[in-house]
C-alpha cells in the first residue's frame, strides 16, 4: 500500500517522488520508501523500492536533496549525490538517517554513520520525526526542520552528516515545512512560513534561527 508522499525534487530532466510504501500488505506498517519518476508530472514510472528497513527501524517520512557542492563527500567523478534524509522508526525511538544515490535514485547506499540525529534523550520523547531539509544559500548551510515532541526544531549542518540544534518552536504536529514567500508579490519583502500537518502555520523571519511575527505581539 502507498502512504505519505515526500522527497519531491527535480534533477537532470526527471521529477522524483518518494513515498511510504508497504510492499507486503494493504495495511499500514513495514514502511519502505517507494520511488517514481516523471518528465512532466503527469505520467509516472514506478521504480524499484528505494529504501528498505534496517537495524534502525522502518522508513518513515523525510525529504531528499541534490548535494551539488558535494558538501557530504558522497559525490564521485563530478556526479553530485542525491541524498535522502528520513526517519527510522523502531519500538524504542525514532532517529534521523541519510542515504545517497549516484545513479539518479536507482540504487541507494545508507550512510555508515547513521543515525545522524538521535534526540530521544534530549526531549524524553520517542516522537522525533519527519525531517525536511533544504539548502540555505545566505548562510551556506543545510537546514533541517524536524518535528520533536510538541513542536518543530531547527538544525543546521555543513555536510548533511553532522547537525547542530538551533531552536524549537512549539505548537506544531508532524511533517514540518519552512519556506520563504514574497509579501504581496514583492520579492524584496519576504516572510518565512513555518507549517505543520495540522494546518497550523506561523509567519516570521529566518536566518538559521526562526523568529515568529507573533513574538512581536506578546
Regions found by a protein language model. Give the residues of each.
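Catalytic-core region of carbohydrate-active enzymes that cleave or remodel glycosidic bonds
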Residues: 181-184, 192, 201-212
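Beta-rich catalytic cores
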Residues: 4, 31, 60, 127-129, ...
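Blade-loop segments of beta-propeller domains
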Residues: 32-35, 41-71
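Conserved small/polar residues in nucleotide/adenosyl-binding loops
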Residues: 2-6, 210-215
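Hydrophobic core segments of beta-strands in well-ordered, beta-rich domains
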Residues: 4-24, 46-50, 65-66, 73-91, ...
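Blade-edge beta-strand/turn elements of extracellular beta-propeller
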Residues: 41-53, 104-122, 154-170, 203-212
